[in-house]
Amino acid sequence: MRWLEFASRVDGEAVEAVSEAFSRVASGGVVVEPDVVTGADDGFTVGAQATVRAYVPVDDRAPEKQSALEQALWHLRTIWPVGELSVREVDEQDWANVWKKHYATFRVGHRLVIRPSWLEYSPSPNDVVVTLDPGAAFGTGLHPTTRRCLELLEVVVRPGDEVLDVGTGSGILALAARGLGAARVVATDVDLLAVDAARENVAFNQVDRQITVLHGSVDSAPAGDSYDVVVANIIARVIIELAPRLVARVRPRGVLVVGGIIADPADAVANELGRLGVVLQRYVDGDWITFLGYLDGTN
């Protein structure tokens, strides 16, 4: 089989909208590849632009999908800086590996290092290395809110904590939590492809006994269990919908981290969580919002 690769260069604030447009035509998922800049002092930073990429099979529907995507990008271009759609064919044997060249090892926070599994890395003594093979459908922590969630986990996860990761994707946050000292992590995702990818990454990092990956959402975690840290890096609408159940899973004086939120609905998320007794700190990364929430033990 041959595949069409669709790609567009966009500014950071347009990533979510463009990714949504791509996902409507590419059922296999979307790759978001922010620019990675390597510093002279072993630092890795993310640039202001990203490439959104997806693959669809070359079949009778491919021209229709291309036309629909071009039209969607034309409309989005009236709001944000969005590049033209580039299209190229790749062979089956190339498709499995073509996206790998767009990834690099990079550092997040003070200790976390995210390493694609096919790249070598020599860790420093204090590094917490998370090794990922995300597959073409899943990111590796370069999205602004994923990075912020990783940075917050580095601050709030304590040795021996139990952590719930809702919407785990590649498993990056669950793996980071374990690497930072969590004794047990439960990770869930409604997408079976994500569940498979996360389980493979958990196995690759040899933490099968500490991390359990389940198909589903917050209710898929064992009934009655609560956690020191609950993290959900998804989208605002789903966070609002799940808010009561997410908060119910946080232990008294525990921590809730929610991300994947664009600026416009952020106040609605804050209002819903505040109504449930969560005291919030807001972190802004461009047009993306992440909340760190604390329970005071009264819930």
Placement of each model-derived feature along the sequence:
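Conserved short alpha-helix immediately C-terminal to the canonical SAM/SAH-binding motif I
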Residues: L193-A197, V238, P265
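Conserved SAM/SAH cofactor-binding pocket of Class I
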Residues: A136-P222, S226
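A short glycine-rich, Lys/Arg-flanked "PGG" loop and its adjoining helix->strand segment in the class I
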Residues: A243-V255
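Hydrophobic beta-strand segment of the Class I
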Residues: V230-V231
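Class I S-adenosylmethionine-dependent transferase superfamily signal
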Residues: F22, L153, L246
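Active-site capping/gating segments
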Residues: I261-N299
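N-terminal auxiliary segments of SAM/dcSAM-dependent transferases
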Residues: A7-P123
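A generic alpha-to-beta junction signature in SAM-dependent methyltransferases
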Residues: A26, V157, V250-P252
